[in-house]
Amino acid sequence: MNFKISVIIPVYNAKDDISQAIDSIINQTIGFDNIELIVVDDASTDNSKDIIKSYQSKYDNIKLIELSQNSGLPGKPRSKGIDYATSDYIVFLDSDDIYENDAFEILYDTILKENSDFVISSHYINLDGDMVKANLLSTDEELISLNPLKNQETFDKLSCNHLVAPWGKIYRKELITKNNIRFPEDSLCEDTYFYFKCLINSNNVTLLPKNYLYVYNTFENRKTAIHGHDMKKFNNFLKGMIYTKDLLKDINLSINVFLSENISSLLLIFSNLNKSDKKRAVLKIYDFEKDLDILIPRKEISILNNFILKKQFKLAIFISNCYSFLYNNKFIKNFYRKFNNKKNS
């Protein structure tokens, strides 16, 4: 059967959420018979596979791909899903999130009408039940089509961190296969690398600022281990940054937006490390940044970063400890998250 869209869901121990995710695909107004659903289980140890198999018994268009060993990161299962996709268009979904019922109809119609390489929609952020709109851009336009490499302004506009997640988008599969685009399997920032490789190989990217088609859930204590803060995550994140920086080295445009936003994320991870790990991590940050001229707009992050670049490592670690205290205060953390997201809505 020829499907309009292949949907890829990476799964690891998602028994509490996977049914809701799958149901959001089954209920699409484009018609579930037009969808190929590929679920890649990353060696779950709970009953996620049993839940998926129960859906499989009812629907012929659900494929379950079982990895024999847990990869620890979502890159491998997503790339494996691409290998199994048979339709001309690909959509990604995280196992603890959902799509709005009309999402695929809107995305599919848009990519055909605009002849886009990929389409990006706006999304909701579910902050423990508080639904916040996350806008792509501050604009009154309902649809914007851009050539990513046309000029610096356009590239900067498309380089913001809130755009890089693979979900909330529809991709022309030919873009991915022709350019051998896959997710790195040994690092974090794998979605950033994938996004930018799609971006620099695209001639036409379409944004739907007024269409909120995806719900990103941020339930406290429910997100996977990649949302923790330890030296392994720090190293994996830095490795992913290096991969993407190397990918973009020949585009003849500034990559300051990518660098500044990801350095900010790296410094937040750094701030939550233990004392001995911080002593090692601060040197790695310095080595990565010492020959770069990165402008960081967030003042508190810029202050911390400047101490590192001046090799005032003890002071940088002290300041990071203060940031860690504030970040891990539940009241302050939730207030900041909600304020920051509402400010951009």
What does each model-found stretch correspond to?
Residues 14-28:
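Short, well-formed alpha-helical segments that are part of the catalytic scaffolds
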Residues 90:
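Short aromatic/hydrophobic "clamp" motif used to bind/position activated sugar donors
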Residues 67-85:
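Glycine-rich, basic loop-to-helix element that forms the pyrophosphate-binding segment
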Residues 77-78, 95-209, 214-232:
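Donor-binding/catalytic cores of nucleotide-activated saccharide
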Residues 3-6, 24, 36, 193:
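Cell-envelope/extracellular polymer assembly enzymes that use nucleotide-activated donors
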Residues 33-43, 65-67, 95:
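Short beta-strand/loop segment that forms part of the nucleotide-sugar
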Residues 24, 41-50, 69-71:
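A conserved acidic beta->alpha catalytic loop
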Residues 275-345:
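Membrane-interface aromatic/basic loop that binds lipid-linked glycans or pyrophosphate carriers
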